[in-house]
Amino acid sequence: MADLSALKDIATTAEPAAPVHVKKVDAQGRSYATGKRKDAVARVWIKPGSGKITVNGKPFSDYFARPVLQMILQQPVVAAARDGQFDIDATVAGGGLSGQAGAVRHGISKALTYFEPGLRAVLKRGGFLTRDSRVVERKKYGRAKARRSFQFSKR
């Protein structure tokens, strides 16, 4: 019976298996995260503020002129009900505008979870924390594109 009591002691002193998310903030009070989408990589810093979003030193509405891309950028902040509460500064490189907008969105989502770990469930449910792994399929030899064959003439 002594063996069983030892097991009970181990079971009661064991730590919970679920990871505890801790707030990650630097000396300036900012949270940092990287986001990726297609060939674009974004580095994002967020801090409490008035809701100003800058991308590569420009206001996001100037950098991303299309309203669809602006909406993509704001999705995680709106979903977390933190609109106008954080200043967001992002630098993004590589890819096109659509990939860059997706990369910044991914970075904002991760930075929000580092700043407020309680938002993780909301953002994960919205699919903002998942890295979209779809990339362009490579071109194969003997074909016109990745899957398109050259035109075939029967005669």
From Swiss-Prot:
The keyword Ribonucleoprotein applies. One of its GO terms (biological process) is translation. It comes from the Bacteria. GO terms for cellular component: cytosolic small ribosomal subunit. HAMAP family: Ribosomal_uS9_B (MF_00532_B). Belongs to the universal ribosomal protein uS9 family. InterPro entries: Ribosomal_Su5_D2-typ_SF (IPR020568), Ribosomal_uS9 (IPR000754), Ribosomal_uS9_bac/plastid (IPR023035), Ribosomal_uS9_CS (IPR020574), Ribsml_uS5_D2-typ_fold_subgr (IPR014721). It holds the Pfam family Ribosomal_S9. The keyword Ribosomal protein applies. Coiled coil: none annotated. One of its GO terms (molecular function) is structural constituent of ribosome. The lineage of its organism: Bacteria, Pseudomonadati, Pseudomonadota, Alphaproteobacteria, Hyphomicrobiales. Keywords: Ribonucleoprotein, Ribosomal protein. This is Small ribosomal subunit protein uS9.
